[in-house]
Amino acid sequence: MTVTPHLFIPGPTNIPDAVRMAMNIPMEDMRSPEFPKFTLPLFEDLKKAFKMKDGRVFIFPSSGTGAWESAVENTLATGDKVLMSRFGQFSLLWVDMCERLGLKVEVCDEEWGTGVPVEKYADILAKDKNHEIKAVFVTHNETATGVSSDVAGVRKALDAAKHPALLMVDGVSSVGSLDMRMGEWGVDCCVSGSQKGFMLPTGLGILAVSQKALDINKSKNGRMNRCFFSFEDMIKTNDQGFFPYTPATQLLRGLRTSLDLLFAEGLDNVFARHTRLASGVRAAVDAWGLKLCAKEPKWYSDTVSAILVPEGIDSNAITKTAYYRYNTSFGLGLNKVAGKVFRIGHLGMLDEVMIGGALFAAEMALKDNGVNLKLGSGTGAAAEYFSKNATKSATALTPKQAKAA
């Protein structure tokens, strides 16, 4: 019997059956008079996932990187000064994009395993009396190192300095899994993608934009050249329920069902489930005598754990053993932590028993590659935690059942 490898990477994530079935439909006319009846409510419901107070959400047929680019090109001009930090592969790539697009980037280089340096940001913003900095960037969840950063803290720093800079957030591996309070935190652009917390295949770049950022887009002269990722083209057609070019219609149908599942479970319950699963993984890591790449508990991510392996052991060998011997996929270490960590993704459509299987495979792969641990130690610690904290699995419920649960 052939079994599809068990997937525990930090994206793409597992796709619920209901979402797959929603996408398994014939092609449809994306310019039919009926199409807006589907898309207009979808745009509005997406705003709920970001907890927005105003503004709008754009859906591009791209990965999250496309949404990154759109956020930058539509709100900033070549030569604008921006404040960023670099502490993992994806925060690094965002800095690289901004530099290549012609922005003047002030970078705070931080140790991998830490996150956005809120105190440094506060000091830099307080000293920027002429408001030369036009935007401040935050990678909410750095998947390369399993680090989450304090978006609300950055907003407080901006407010304390009475600074008007835009607050730009990479929420690719956080939205739909970790709490994102875009309105409360005063986030101006929040980037996400379909393949993480939204539990879809890759292919949708989702960008939530505040009214402040929309107003800047409308009034500012000298902005970057753009075409495919233009806000103006999107607004003109989205208002009618359409798109400026061919949309990924099946993915949009899947997104509708994904949102229904998230709302049926309740966003706060979704976030609590991710915290429980992450806590179980951390209990296992501790029992194995290993450490996370994240340096302190304040940095711990509830969507992915990057686990440091002992010196002299190649983490790539562990992921290969897990894949070929135990039919389980874990994330590789990237860039500076390549060969030093492997990553367990615990986001999306997962519950305690599924995570238990991931830990079972990880434990055996670690042991097979010479890590000194006792089989059953990590899985036992996680089971102990889950047995005390688990609730009825939301992933097993249909939206109708979840409402009644």
From Swiss-Prot:
It comes from the Bacteria. Pfam families: Aminotran_5. Pathway: One-carbon metabolism; formaldehyde assimilation via serine pathway. Keywords: Aminotransferase, Pyridoxal phosphate, Transferase. GO terms for molecular function: alanine-glyoxylate transaminase activity; L-serine-glyoxylate transaminase activity; L-serine-pyruvate transaminase activity. It catalyses: glyoxylate + L-serine = 3-hydroxypyruvate + glycine. The modification N6-(pyridoxal phosphate)lysine is found at residue 196. Its EC number is 2.6.1.45. Its cofactor is pyridoxal 5'-phosphate. The keyword Transferase applies. GO terms for biological process: glycine biosynthetic process, by transamination of glyoxylate. Belongs to the class-V pyridoxal-phosphate-dependent aminotransferase family. This is Serine--glyoxylate aminotransferase. It comes from Hyphomicrobium methylovorum.
